[in-house]
Amino acid sequence: MATKDPTAVERANLLNMAKLSIKGLIESALSFGRTLDSDYPPLQQFFVVMEHCLKHGLKVRKSFLSYNKTIWGPLELVEKLYPEAEEIGASVRDLPGLKTPLGRARAWLRLALMQKKMADYLRCLIIQRDLLSEFYEYHALMMEEEGAVIVGLLVGLNVIDANLCVKGEDLDSQVGVIDFSMYLKNEEDIGNKERNVQIAAILDQKNYVEELNRQLNSTVSSLHSRVDSLEKSNTKLIEELAIAKNNIIKLQEENHQLRNENKLILMKTQQHIEVTKVDVETELQTYKHSRQGLDEMYNEARRQLRDESQLRQDVENELAVQVSMKHEIELAMKLLEKDIHEKQDTLIGLRQQLEEVKAINIEMYQKLQGSEDGLKEKNEIIARLEEKTNKITAAMRQLEQRLQQAEKAQMEAEDEDEKYLQECLSKSDSLQKQISQKEKQLVQLETDLKIEKEWRQTLQEDLQKEKDALSHLRNETQQIISLKKEFLNLQDENQQLKKIYHEQEQALQELGNKLSESKLKIEDIKEANKALQGLVWLKDKEATHCKLCEKEFSLSKRKHHCRNCGEIFCNACSDNELPLPSSPKPVRVCDSCHALLIQRCSSNLP
């Protein structure tokens, strides 16, 4: 039997010890779940093992006083190969209390672990074998393949967070002895450990599933709240539309009443104009001798007639405008009714929340009361107008009666004149009697003239009253114009309500699309959750090949667990880190899980 090379046996032993220490440190640190400090036993053993690995095959350097065999020389060489390592070298040299090169090397290892760059630093050192040959023998661990394997194992330590106090420790005088009792365990401990690992994996899966359920519940609750708010706003818009419709109906009724009143006023004014025309004509025929004073009254009456005709034309134009506005309102109401009929199917489910809009109804009821008060004021104005028109008609009737009396007096005077002429021709003897009678008639005529003067004064007073009535009518036309402006403002408000209604309808459609998209996302997440519930943490013994690239595991190609799916992959197929719901810190995941998680995060973003 050929004897093995003792240096190769030493390298294999150190490699196995490095594997055990690194694996135990990672597993214990992950189960510990907190930042590691200097008193953590697995971490202390790891530094001891690394010190032995770096010391293997180290050349002895001679000095004037003694032999020097330390690992600080090759570690100090890292600064020249890796520029980022200059900071750690300078901080090690500046540390107080470090007197020996071994103490500096130990401090360097601790700082490199805290920076999570120990594997990068040592990888740069292993590549430069021509420089390492100055410090190590050809059979040293750092010069052979085992050194590359150990550097590959050190990459797994990047998941560990350590907070080591280097200033207060006595790194110069520590004795580096490997404690094998931490790695020699009986079968019961191994079984308990496997059970603990399985329980931890199950708990991780459970925590992940619970976190997914919480996220789904939060998204569903937020969507429900948004749907409720939109339903409330839609019900408010429906109520406002109904109120606007009622207001439009009331305004139409008021418009109809005003039109009827305007028609009555026009009829009365026409009758009044006709009566005044007849009166003026009779006055002109009966009182030709006193035409000068009556001509002035006639001109004034004609002016009044012109003014009244102009007022009638203005009123007719306003009525035509109101009729056209009424047609526009009817068209708008038809369009609104069509829209309301089309949206009734979508608004049936929203009518159950009408109780929440009572406050709005009360406010609108107050507005209705205010509009009713305005209507009452308008009705009072109309009643006043009717009273004024009644007064005018009564005055016109009195004028007609006076004119009839004057006509009768004129006819009697003409009859008497004819009789007088006949009597003069036939009876010359009775002239004195007739003269006396004529004197009596003259007295009567003088009294009649006095009566006519008084009647003229009364006519002038009546004309002044009619002028006042015309001024009142003008004021009333101005009020009608203001009412027209108010009607236009109400029409603008109705159009604004229509715009708001259409905008709310579009918002509801967009929210419906978003709800459908969110439902699809929830179904996808549920399917992913169902798929994740079936995942199991695969044991190291059961995997011999990488699941993705299907390459066989070896000393240089070691196994790595994916913290998401639990399968085992090589370093190339699992060189990704992402935070999972089960662990807030970034952990290793495979390429497929990395792509799935990135896609899920991007889909959740707005």
From Swiss-Prot:
Residues 210-534 form a coiled coil. One of its GO terms (cellular component) is cytoplasm. Its main location: nucleus. SUPFAM superfamilies: FYVE/PHD zinc finger, RUN domain-like. Residues 37-169 form the RUN domain. Interacts with BMX. This is RUN and FYVE domain-containing protein 2. It comes from Pongo abelii.
